[in-house]
From Swiss-Prot:
Function: Catalyzes the conversion of glucosamine-6-phosphate to glucosamine-1-phosphate.
GO molecular function per UniProt: magnesium ion binding; phosphoglucosamine mutase activity; phosphomannomutase activity
UniProt protein name: Phosphoglucosamine mutase
Species, as recorded: Thermosipho africanus (strain TCF52B)
Residue positions of the active site: 93 (phosphoserine intermediate)
Necessary cofactors: Mg(2+)
Keyword Repressor: no
Catalysed reaction, written as an equation: alpha-D-glucosamine 1-phosphate = D-glucosamine 6-phosphate
Length: 430
């Protein structure tokens, strides 16, 4: 059976994602590694249950568990790299609180398809170790400190004094750590959505709901928004306008090029990134490579082509000379560093990077394959002068429709027509 999606194992808790599934995953990983497995989680109420099941699975296989508590996914990735070990992050990232997920990390990196398939096969056949070899559970109190120290050393010359930031931590895994780190660098921080109760993670907040903190953006403040597990980051500029992942990539690509960090003068983006970003980068002698949607595909291309910077419009951005995965805090610090070095406001920098109007619709369906119908294909063929992408979500029962072009009204009409067509054929299948 296929358990892994585009970003680990993810689903509604106690429907698809059960304690038994978590136990089987833990047992499979525990049998594959020597020694220890690090575990961290976000703030969802189901995290404790899934953590307990994972621990039982891992220790029954004879491996030790190092429990890191609540911390962002990129922090766990760093720990596994420093410790040359495996890790499992309990999080569904930007998804609603009824979802959770299990992301397996090996020595800093997410798994390739071949290793996921091997784990899935192992999950079918639970293997217990003898009683004298049952693993232990260690509360790893140094995890947060290790990550903090790593960030402090990376950006030891960064001074954010005088910068006023409203920080939306999405009631998620960054609620405690990330504001402290930005304050360390001198920024004045106002934190919102930082009272996690297990049920409010990502709920009308965080990087998927930037409009909800616009009222806080006054008197020269800028906004920083994370998702539930802290691997994404977007900004609001001083005018309350979204400074999304495409803008961040454009701004920081120029900064990395000046610093001699942009290997091969190339950047990796996905098919969802705006044509305006590509033209801006090309005008600055930077080539653009496009991949399928998903940070794993971005990372694969970066490693294959020896590229330092890659990411998604959603704010999932990888600085490979800084981290092995998308890191919302590093993305924030790279963006703030570029802003400080430019001597300009974020709003002024935003105007330099063009952004063609985009319309994105999420069409709920019972069958995600419906988008492949002949009628939808013919409709897409008939559209001229607009970029259209129709694709199924890897984590939710929806088909995503993206239309991009010179006129917002026309893009909206096209997107709605396609969405209606998908709904029509989905209803016929029910």
């Amino acid at each position: 059976m296929r358990y892994f999606g585009t970003d680990g194992i993810r689903g509604v808790v106690n429907e698809f994602l059960t304690p038994e599934l978590a136990f089987r995953l833990g047992n499979a990983v525990g049998n594959m590694v020597n020694g220890k497995v690090f575990i961290a989680k976000d703030t969802r109420n189901s995290g404790d249950m899934l953590e307990a099941a994972l621990i039982a699975g891992i220790t029954s296989a004879g491996a030790d568990v190092y429990r890191c508590g609540i911390m962002p996914t990129p922090a766990l990735a760093l720990i596994t790299k420093l410790e040359d070990a495996a890790g499992i992050m309990i999080s569904a990232s930007h998804n609603p609180p009824e979802y959770n997920g299990l992301k397996v990390i090996m020595k800093g990196y997410k798994l390739p398809d071949s290793l996921e398939e091997r784990i899935e096969n192992e999950m079918q056949n639970v293997k217990y170790n003898s009683f004298e070899k049952v693993g232990r559970v260690i509360d790893y109190r140094l995890a947060e400190e290790e990550y903090f120290n790593y960030i402090k050393e990376l950006y030891k010359n960064l001074d954010l004094s005088g910068i006023k930031i409203v920080m939306d931590v999405a009631n998620g895994a960054t609620f405690n750590l990330n504001p402290k780190i930005l304050e360390y660098f001198g920024a004045k921080i106002e934190v919102v959505n930082n009272e996690p109760d297990g049920f409010n993670i990502n709920k009308d907040c965080g990087s998927t709901h930037p409009e909800n903190i616009k009222n806080y953006i006054v008197n020269g403040k800028i906004g920083i928004l994370h998702d539930g597990d802290g691997d994404r980051c977007i900004f609001l500029d001083e005018n309350g306008q979204e400074f999304h992942g495409d803008k961040i990539i454009g701004l920081t690509a120029l900064q990395l090029k000046k610093e001699g960090r942009l290997k091969n003068d190339k950047v990796v983006v996905t098919i969802l990134s705006n044509m305006g970003l590509e033209r801006f980068l090309n005008e600055n002698s930077i080539d653009v490579v496009r991949t399928k949607v998903g940070d794993r595909y971005v990372l694969e291309e970066m490693l294959k082509e020896n590229i330092t910077l890659g990411g998604e419009r959603s704010g999932h951005i990888i600085y490979l000379d800084r981290s092995t995965t998308g890191d919302g805090l590093i993305t924030a610090l790279e963006t703030l560093s570029a802003m400080v070095n430019s001597g300009k406001r974020l709003a002024d920098l935003s105007n330099l990077i063009p952004d063609y109007p985009q319309v994105m619709l999420n069409v709920k369906v019972s069958d995600k394959e419906v988008y492949k119908s002949k009628e939808v294909f013919e409709k897409l063929k008939s559209i001229k002068d607009y970029r259209v992408i129709v694709r199924p979500s890897g984590t939710e029962p929806v088909v995503r429709v993206l239309v991009e072009g010179p006129d917002m009204d026309e893009s909206t009409i096209i997107a709605n027509d396609i969405a209606d067509l998908i709904k029509k054929f989905d209803n016929k299948k029910e």
